[in-house]
Amino acid sequence: MNKLLPFNMPPISKGGMLGMLAGAGGGAGGLGLYQELGRTALTGTSDTISVSLSTAKPYLMVLCNYITGSSNVDGRMFFNSDGGSGGSSNYAWRIERDGNTASTTTSTYGINTEESYFNNAFQYYFINNFSDYEKLVTGINGHDLSSGAASVAPTRCLTVGKWITTGSQITTVATTNIDSGDYASGSEMVVLGYDPTDTVGTSIWEELASVELTGASDTIDSGTIANKKYLWIEYFINASGSAGANMRFNSNSSSVYSTRRTANGGSDDTYVNQDKIECRVEYGNAFGSGFIGNNDGQQKLLILNETAQSTAGAGTAPAANQVWGKSSVTTNITSIQIVNDGGGDFVAGSYLKVWGFN
């Protein structure tokens, strides 16, 4: 069977990184653990969210659920009190929004994570945190610009940045707003860390569902899962004929979804008032991996990367799809469905896995 890797994601496979993250062992010869290092949830409005880490780890993962209301925010990520809204020139970044030409800034005071937006956002970042090297950041975020409506597709940003400081590790992660709005009560930043030399600890990611088909079907259903604020999903489609993966939450097939996606680095396509999130890049075998912000009382935002096999064999390059999806329903997700929109079937070997934490 051809092995598929997701586009613009760390290497993940059925028994790979997600299995590692949800594992119960540690150490160089065993499984690694992404552990929670710290979090901050606002209880009022603020221009800054800062998280002090319980310990420094060489690999960091940052998840953000931001609530902003009707006024714009424009975030800058910075580390160890170096930067924020000025006073530092130790950062450089590149950001691309909605398929437009990327912009760059050098010798500045923080990493641009958002561009100006309002309402709600879900974001995640991976950061290398080695003392002897500049700290490199890669992140993806999705913004919901129309609260309560599926008639507007989410916007998105791709961010890469660096903090040039060497000789120490990141021990504080923060973001500050330089626009007119504020981060509202309920906004949250969570920082996870991984050290391959750890031998004890508990993974923050809990397996919520693991479903593998044994026959033909048009749906892979997680069944009821525990209500968690942060969800990480992975699916593989073993296709017979023209079968393609799309997504629903809580078996809701009403027109409550909207999607922004870009295939193979092309321009963005948007879909509004749909009965599913449009994940498929091509019909046929495909592998997808992504994160969902499942914040209570907020619309649900998905960031997904899918790789499609295309024609089997090394003579054809795989297809890549990046997806930003939204459900306008604010009820929390307690089940996930991968649904087929083609004339073929999902067949035996197709699977869906879900992890989560609060």
Predicted regions and their residues:
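Sec-dependent, cleavable N-terminal signal peptides
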Residues: 1-2
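N-terminal glycine-rich anion-binding loops that anchor highly charged ligand groups
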Residues: 11
